[in-house]
Amino acid sequence: MLFRSVFEHLFREYGLPKRIRSDNGIPFASAHALHGLSRLAVWWLRLGIEIERIKPGNPQQNGRHERMHRVLKQATARPPAGNMLQQQDKFESFIQEYNYERPHEGIQMKTPAALYEPSKRIYKGLPELQYPFHDRTVVITECGRICLDRRKISVSTVLGGQKVGIKQVDDQIWQVSFMQYDLGYFDMDSCRIEPGPNPFGPRLLTM
């Protein structure tokens, strides 16, 4: 995943954020996956980053980011440069001016660079997953299934290769958890997961 290598570079240089707010599109979310998770979102969760989704069709909930994109497009792509090298020069000039030179009204006429502090959370790769309060720890297959007692329970391909905890809560009924998040339940007869309440669903956000 190209975007993963880009984020790894950013996390090594600037540290890990507490949370990342995004819309519900690719690669941040997957409409057809369990709870809208994507492989990128799963990786963020593994790193201890909270995922915060805006409500669909409400870009104003991420207004600062949307405005930055408008300013970026206006300054660098209207009109675009004649070639890739010239376009990159325009991007770098924009970054210098936007972050280090131009004062912003929203931050008392200071520059973003004057206020920015890197995260103190150091990127160290993925921590090991453990489920001491579950009956079993199983690894989701790359095709998105739990293999249990010769049965194959479909969960989600975005969790392929990840360890999950399963706990029997009733006769033939098992709860599935990923990290501290309860994903849903499956029974041994249907071999299909029934999603629980979405722990990553959009909610009312403030800027």
Where does each model-flagged region fall?
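RNase H-like DDE/DDD metal-dependent nuclease/strand-transfer catalytic core used by mobile genetic elements
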Residues: 1-93, 97
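C-terminal, beta-rich DNA-binding module of retroviral/retroelements integrases
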Residues: 99-207
